[in-house]
């Protein structure tokens, strides 16, 4: 959950059992194109609706949106949210989007869900938290009206939320019991992901076991499954994505700077019930965000099949053509929190100082 602030991650690359792009001429690195986000505030989350319409969000109440594939971005600050951080964004068009905020003041009402239906000109607060111990890490939607929001556990219970009308939010009363100390990480808005019309997965850490919480029926019932990712009071599973109902990848690590080589990933081919560690990605620190190249969350193509990208903020970024069997670094890419794709040729990384990179395979 990053507990109000993230520990700075070390900047370095380490040798591991991966392939090198220069050694395999048939592998072509993606094209990376910097774009002007319209803000210098740090960006934390990104959501492409399609190759043209993309939303991103971040610090100081900031959001930014493009309707031309990133040639131009229009940034704004939500009134009344200037002291908040938008740790997640979900959007459905150039006009309809949701933002999820946290704060640093300790006020539980700093967690809010905002919605715009006019492209960010005006925003409505849909939900404001009053649980003094809740800390919400991310949210995800199946449709413009159906979504879930996930919180760290409180007294052994996850006070998660669900909307079925895109307006009101209710408690999910049947979440799996939490392990002692279990929480999630608000690093990129990707500790929660949806797929299809009713599937969702949540990545957790903080306890002795990093787990995946999964639903197949839109949040009516849930199951908890163990992963082999290392977990600790400062580590665990940070980010998860599925390219279909069965095949997914989870990434994590540890925020402890004494453990810089902690990044790990695992894959599942049975909907998250069982997981197998992959070769470690060539990044340092924890993996903040990851995404399949052909698909992000609830939709998109799948042209590159098993290809995916991971980013570890200051620890660099890397991509895999085969779900973690082999890895290639993205040279010079550092300081990015989140990555998401509308299609293989239309992906975006967002990060510190308002930086945006378009990534195209």
Predicted regions: what they are:
Residues 8-15:
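Bacterial N-terminal signal peptides
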Residues 1-6:
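Bacterial N-terminal signal peptides that target proteins for export
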């Amino acid at each position: 959950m990053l507990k109000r602030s993230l520990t700075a991650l070390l900047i370095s690359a380490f040798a591991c059992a991966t392939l090198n792009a220069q050694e395999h001429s048939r592998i072509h690195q993606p094209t990376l194109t910097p774009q002007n986000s319209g803000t210098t505030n740090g960006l934390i989350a990104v959501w492409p609706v399609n190759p043209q319409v993309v939303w991103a969000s971040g610090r100081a109440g900031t959001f930014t949106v493009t309707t031309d594939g990133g040639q131009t971005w229009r940034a704004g600050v939500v009134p009344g949210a200037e002291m908040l951080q938008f740790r997640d964004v979900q959007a459905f068009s150039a006009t309809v989007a949701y933002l999820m905020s946290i704060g640093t003041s300790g006020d539980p009402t700093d967690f809010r869900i905002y919605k715009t239906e006019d492209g960010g000109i005006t925003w409505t607060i849909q939900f404001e938290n009053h649980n003094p111990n809740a800390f919400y890490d991310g949210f995800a939607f199946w449709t413009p009206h159906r979504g879930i929001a996930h919180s760290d556990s409180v007294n052994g219970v996850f006070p998660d939320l669900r909307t079925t009308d895109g307006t009101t939010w209710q408690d999910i009363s049947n979440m799996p019991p939490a392990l002692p100390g279990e929480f999630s990480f608000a690093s990129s808005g990707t500790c929660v992901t949806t797929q299809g019309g009713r599937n969702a997965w949540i990545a957790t850490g903080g306890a002795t076991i990093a787990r995946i919480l999964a639903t197949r029926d839109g949040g009516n019932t849930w199951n908890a499954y163990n992963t082999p990712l290392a977990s600790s009071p400062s580590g665990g599973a940070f980010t998860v994505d599925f390219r279909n109902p069965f095949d997914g990848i989870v990434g994590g690590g540890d925020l402890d700077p004494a453990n810089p080589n902690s990044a790990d990933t695992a894959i599942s081919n049975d909907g998250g019930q069982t997981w197998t560690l992959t070769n470690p990605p060539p990044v340092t620190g924890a993996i903040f965000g990851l995404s399949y190249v052909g698909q992000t969350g609830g939709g998109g193509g799948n042209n590159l099949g098993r290809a995916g990208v991971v980013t570890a903020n200051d620890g660099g970024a890397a991509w895999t053509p085969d779900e973690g069997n082999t890895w290639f670094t993205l040279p010079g890419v550092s300081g990015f929190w989140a990555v998401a794709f509308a299609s293989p040729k239309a992906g975006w990384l967002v990060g510190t100082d308002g930086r945006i990179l378009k990534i195209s395979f």
